[in-house]
Curated annotation (Swiss-Prot):
Any one GO biological process: adult behavior
Species of the source: Pongo abelii (Sumatran orangutan)
GO cellular component: endoplasmic reticulum membrane; nuclear envelope
Domain remark from Swiss-Prot or TrEMBL: The RING-type zinc finger domain mediates polyubiquitination of the interacting protein.
Cytoplasmic side: 1-564
Function: E3 ubiquitin-protein ligase which promotes polyubiquitination and degradation by the proteasome pathway of ZIC2.
Lineage: Eukaryota, Metazoa, Chordata, Craniata, Vertebrata
Enzyme Commission code(s) on record: 2.3.2.27
Subcellular location: Endoplasmic reticulum membrane; Nucleus envelope
Xref: PROSITE patterns: ZF_RING_1 (PS00518), ZF_RING_2 (PS50089)
Name of this protein: E3 ubiquitin-protein ligase RNF180
Residue spans, topological domain Extracellular: 586-592
Presence of the UniProt keyword Coiled coil in the record: no
């Protein structure tokens, strides 16, 4: 009690922590710790109306040694030359950097890295007024603390700040609102408190601190919040609530999100509460692998039933700061046991780069801010397809081991699906373009060389067999040739379909119709026409043994000399009979 009184009476002044927000999306892009040392004097000059307009600085001068992570990435990408600074959330222009020829500002300072004041909003915020985001979208770290010995998540910080926070928490008697510092998406939440104070340790004012307002006595506080679609923690947006994206230099002990549809029982939590103190227990063991697994698995069951109100106990999650000697922004995760003291924890804490953390979770910065485009999705599909083919090949060879029962069933299903796809692709090469069915007695048409099945050709040549156009290119079909190899392949691969078409063709009248051919009458002595009988057409159904293609292909009358036709007709029976008749007539009219 004596120490508490000293804390209450000591230093009532509250130190301010300022942040910059994007003028377009209102997201936090930098804190006061990223500016030069003369930042406070610069703000005072800007507020003074009597200052000359020429001496007013219109940019925020950034400290190169403590730049935010997103600015450092842009500078390294530009290889420390010249570039623009765009908002990492909405892409709006915020400022720029120039290390080639460093310009000077109107205030006389170098503007190597600067943010424009007209494109950013300066917000001085009381350290005690900054609230943490919704408890539903943060992890649930538990810390062991007491009045005599403070064991906190933060790796460092001043004790005066802790005393000031305790003083503000005890003097806050009216029901407060659990507001947000980063406009996270939250829903109305009820929580009961039996505590009067919460011991926490904060860092320098340049880092963000989220402190829930405490209410003395037993009361129920309802928090109404605005909805923002920017930083919702779910799987589809790839863990956008990472502290590294908001310039929070600290270490966080994260836990999986609790189920939103079930009330939270405080009896299961190692929470110790009394009238004068509120302490949180730190688990004795923690697996960082389970952290990533819970981050990626837990929200699947809860994101479909969001928006409901539920009763919960006091959920505390704090984001703390840490002093780092490095220039780049680091993400510190503290994994000490409950029995370890603060110096031991600070000596053995793990330093993880934000990029290493994202790569370890199989995420990329591009996938956090936007979804995969079509090209990336097609690449992923191709990789999965190649992997499935390799697994099938190894399974056929008997070398694929280590596959469980479910994986085996999945592989079998994928194999059957791929086999069906391959079967469909093979069947496409044996389908007629007219009837859209497999070939039955296919014929190749000349001169266009398109292939169609016999029922389709006979149907097309029903009305005009001598000038039948090709159904694809509209070329007049002069002759057709039967394709034996294609017919045998169709009969072998698609036996059922082939037999079904054969039966329907034999039962239909199309079997009596002619095939298309430019069979013109051979004009003999200018008037006698030679026509082929339908019986002859049925005797040679496949056309490979007929000589129909040797007929004339024009409408000329009388004799049209062709040596091939002469030779053929000399050996024909008609000429033999004609020669005998000619000899008989000569003997009858011209006797010797």
């Amino acid at each position: 009690m004596k120490r508490s009184k000293e804390l209450i009476t000591k230093n009532h002044s509250q130190e301010e922590t300022s942040i910059l927000r994007c003028w377009k999306c209102r997201k936090c892009i930098a804190s006061s710790g990223c500016f030069m040392e003369y930042f406070e004097n610069q703000v005072i000059k800007d507020k003074d109306d009597s200052v000359d307009a020429q001496n007013i600085c219109h940019v925020w001068h950034m400290n190169i040694e403590s730049l935010p992570e997103w600015i450092s990435c842009l500078i390294q990408k530009a290889q420390w030359t010249v570039g623009k600074l765009n908002c990492p959330f909405c892409g709006a222009r915020l400022g720029g950097f120039n290390f080639v020829s460093t310009p000077k500002c109107s205030c006389g300072q170098l503007a190597a890295v600067h943010l424009s004041k007209s494109r950013t909003d300066y917000q001085p915020t009381q350290a005690g007024r900054l609230m943490r985001p919704s408890v539903k979208y943060l992890s649930h770290p538990r810390v062991q603390s007491g009045c005599d010995k403070e064991v906190l998540l933060t790796g460092g910080g001043s004790k005066n700040r802790n005393h000031r926070l305790l003083n503000m928490a005890r003097n806050n008697n009216d029901p407060g609102r659990l507001t947000e510092a980063l406009c996270l998406e939250v829903r109305p939440t009820y929580f009961e408190m039996k505590n009067e104070k919460l011991l926490s340790k904060a860092s320098e004012p340049k880092y963000q601190l989220f402190v829930p307002q405490l209410v003395t006595g037993r009361c129920t506080t309802r928090a109404f919040h605005r909805k923002s679609h920017s930083l919702d923690l779910n799987i589809s947006e790839k863990l956008t609530l990472l502290p590294t994206l908001y310039e929070i230099r600290g270490k966080t002990t994260a836990y999986s999100r609790l189920n939103e549809t079930q009330p939270i029982d405080l009896s299961g939590l190692p929470l110790q509460s009394s009238k004068n103190s509120c302490s949180f227990q730190n688990p004795s063991s923690f697996d960082p692998g389970m952290l990533l697994q819970r981050f990626s698995v837990a929200p699947h069951e809860t994101q479909t039933q969001r928006g409901g109100e539920f009763q919960c106990g006091l959920e505390a999650a704090s984001v703390y700061s840490d002093h780092t000697n490095t220039n780049n922004l680091t993400f510190l995760m503290d994994l000490p046991s409950a029995g370890r003291s603060m110096p031991e924890a600070s000596d053995q804490e793990e330093h993880l780069s934000p990029l290493d953390f994202l790569h370890s979770a199989n995420f990329s910065l591009g996938s956090i801010n936007q979804r995969l485009n079509k090209r990336e999705r097609s690449k992923l599909k191709n990789l999965r397809r190649k992997q499935r083919r390799r697994e099938r090949w190894l399974q056929k060879q008997g070398k694929y081991s280590g596959v469980g029962f479910l994986d085996h069933m999945t592989l079998n299903n994928e194999m059957s699906t791929d086999e069906d796809n391959e079967y469909a692709e093979e069947k496409d090469s044996y389908i007629c373009a007219v009837c859209l069915d497999v070939y039955f007695n296919p014929y190749m048409c000349y001169p266009c060389r398109h292939i169609f099945c016999e029922p389709c050709l006979r149907t097309l040549a029903k009305d005009n067999p001598s000038s039948t156009p090709c159904p694809l290119c509209r070329t007049i079909i002069s002759r057709v040739f039967f394709q034996t190899e294609l017919n045998n392949a169709t009969k072998t691969f698609f036996t059922k379909e082939y037999l079904k078409i054969k039966q329907s063709f034999q039962k239909s009248n199309s079997a009596k119709w002619p095939l298309p051919s430019c069979r013109k009458a051979f004009h003999l002595f200018g008037g006698f026409h030679r026509h082929a009988a339908p019986v002859t057409r049925r005797q040679f159904p496949h056309g490979a043994h007929r000589m129909d293609y040797l007929h004339f292909e024009d409408d000329s009358r009388g004799w049209w000399f062709d040596m091939d036709m002469v030779i053929i007709y000399i050996y024909s029976v008609n000429w033999v009979i004609g020669f005998i008749v000619f000899c008989f007539l000569c003997y009858f009219f011209f006797p010797f």
